[in-house]
Amino acid sequence: MSLNMFWFLPTHGDGHYLGTEEGSRPVDHGYLQQIAQAADRLGYTGVLIPTGRSCEDAWLVAASMIPVTQRLKFLVALRPSVTSPTVAARQAATLDRLSNGRALFNLVTGSDPQELAGDGVFLDHSERYEASAEFTQVWRRLLLGETVDFNGKHIHVRGAKLLFPPIQQPYPPLYFGGSSDVAQELAAEQVDLYLTWGEPPELVKEKIEHVRAKAAAHGRKIRFGVRLHVIVRETNDEAWQAAERLISRLDDETIAKAQAAFARTDSVGQQRMAALHNGKRDNLEISPNLWAGVGLVRGGAGTALVGDGPTVAARINEYAALGIDSFVLSGYPHLEEAYRVGELLFPHLDVAIPEIPQPQPLNPQGEAVANDFIPRNVAQS
């Protein structure tokens, strides 16, 4: 099975060390462009663009990278409760059209009550997933070309429609990650690829089996992916030294503050990440070559595969044997590590190298009539 390898655009900051300004670098458009172009040339399938108040806006960043890349896809967040599904569907179709079919979407429900309140969202965990399920139903139906009437608990639309369809049919693939039962049910029922953070393989296997069974109960099959950091070097010793160096500037106060911030979230996945290290520096190798040091201060994905190219490739193939075909990777600093992964790891894997998409024929059309329909449909309206 050929593997889809993704990289990451660090729109929330980058540097040589975690938890300190030392060794940091400015993250501007030019730097993000360098990373995107490196990923494009090295054969990555795409890049994940993060979302939230600590990040630059993912949609604007993705749009700005379209003209400077050729085949790279952009995995961009959809934010239920923050954005309406009709607006999000128009944005998604436009991004897909402008990129010639290089748009992918990542459903992000949010987990920090403080950040969500700042965005005007005052829903608890279960309510957010209810809203996300309704959002996704409307979003998918619009991209499928339906005119949608929907009267849910959280979302109400009447006569919603898209005039401009996406390039990818039936619609751009939808990714999603969540560890709670309600999150896995949403994944099983509506998404195309279920993402998990990089837990030990036996825990990931358990997750995949649960989601696969839930999807089968809905008559569906979905794909699987994992989100990991990578520290790959020419030798295993060099890789472990690089891992220790990454957290060498961390102090106990910074770790404690970070863990306190994570504790206020209601994310089951974040709780599972924190339990891998319990905020302590010792015993961070939680599974062969799987290191939890990143999660001491970084929210979300908090583990890294550490080793030389053949060793890390062997661990990736262990995940692939569970049914995972997509790996969303990152490393610090992201420009240098994109090259290291491409040069030291990719030769030991069966990597699916994406082709440059060919321009799609678009039917000519005049200006929309009365902001409601396109001219070629006048006779049917």
Swiss-Prot record:
User: What protein does this entry describe?
Assistant: Alkanesulfonate monooxygenase
Catalytic activity, per the record?
A: an alkanesulfonate + FMNH2 + O2 = an aldehyde + FMN + sulfite + H2O + 2 H(+)
**How is the quaternary structure described?**
Homotetramer.
Q: Which Pfam families match?
A: Bac_luciferase (PF00296)
* Further remark: FMNH(2) which is absolutely required for this enzymatic reaction, is provided by SsuE.
List keywords of the entry alphabetically: Flavoprotein, FMN, Monooxygenase, Oxidoreductase
Which top EC class applies here? Answer: oxidoreductase
User: Cross-referenced InterPro entries, in alphabetical order?
Assistant: Alkanesulphonate_mOase_FMN-dep, Luciferase-like_dom, Luciferase-like_sf, SsuD_RutA_monooxygenase
PANTHER family xrefs: ALKANESULFONATE MONOOXYGENASE, ALKANESULFONATE MONOOXYGENASE-RELATED
Enzyme Commission (EC) number = 1.14.14.5
Q: Which organism is it from?
A: Escherichia coli O1:K1 / APEC
What's a Gene Ontology MF term here? alkanesulfonate monooxygenase activity
Q: Which family does it belong to?
A: Belongs to the SsuD family.
